Amino acid sequence: MKSSSLENGTLANAGVYEDDLDSDEELVSEEEFENFNNEDSEDDEDSNNESKTAKSQLAEIPFDTLLNAQRDLLKEQQKTKIDRKNMKHTEKVDKKFLAKERNTPLKNCQVKNQFLVFAKFDSLSGNLSKDKVKKNYGFLNEYRVSEIQQLRDELKICKDQERAESIRQTLKSLLSKMERHLEEERAERVMHEFRAQEKERVKEGKKPFYLKRNEQKKLIQMDKYKSMEGTKALDKYIEKKRRRRAQKEKKHLPRARPSANSQNK
């Protein structure tokens, strides 16, 4: 029986032969084999029942709720992806920031306030030509003169003391600017005339002569005196100069020591 079952049954197909089996060993009985098959069939039936119940439950759920659930899942997945990307990005940024902090020289030094400069008057835009500036912005002097006249007329009529004081201050600043502008024009004119004369002398064969700063100031002062000759402005100017010199001399004079009586008082 054994040999026929081994040759014709499943054991022969599985590669089990008579020599490999001992006489004392017994094969699985038919009852046990049927029990195994019954257990497998029961497991399959349970899994089928579970899948059927799940399908029936899904069929009972409305379609809108399923769509909303699917959208929520997709949103959560996208959020997780974005969070991971942000984490990587922040790590990179932090590393770059640390590298910049380490490599910045003079980190704790106090920098002076940077003043904004109009690009037209910046040194990077080229050399300044004063002649072109005068031609292009000459109307500002005319506007300043008219403004001074308007303020003077307003000061005559004004009765408010605070307003009158503010007008006087603005007039003072405008007049000082006008005087400074006239002095600069005078200095440029005088030096231009002197250079033209020196060029003519060099052409005649003479050596060039260069004025020092003190000599330039004296030359400009002489031209100013010549323009004021025969007027009261010259006397006023000389008187003002005399007062300034007197005040400077007073500062340098030695002071008298206080007496003992004044100290006791």
Curated annotation (Swiss-Prot):
Gene Ontology BP, a term: maturation of SSU-rRNA from tricistronic rRNA transcript (SSU-rRNA, 5.8S rRNA, LSU-rRNA)
Basic residues bias locations: 239-255
Compartment annotation: Nucleus, Nucleolus
Protein name as annotated: rRNA biogenesis protein rrp36
Keywords in alphabetical order: Coiled coil, Nucleus, Ribonucleoprotein, Ribosome biogenesis, rRNA processing
Family from the record: Belongs to the RRP36 family.
Subunit text: Associates with 90S and pre-40S pre-ribosomal particles.
Comp. bias (Acidic residues): 17-48
Pfam annotation, one family: RRP36
InterPro entries in alphabetical order: RRP36
Chain positions covered by the region annotation Disordered: 1-59, 231-265
Compositionally biased tracts (Polar residues): 1-11
Organism annotation: Schizosaccharomyces pombe (strain 972 / ATCC 24843) (Fission yeast)
Keyword Coiled coil: yes
Keyword Ribonucleoprotein: yes
S-S bridge residues: none
Coiled-coil positions: 146-204
One GO cellular component term: nucleolus
Function summary: Component of the 90S pre-ribosome involved in the maturation of rRNAs. Required for early cleavages of the pre-RNAs in the 40S ribosomal subunit maturation pathway.
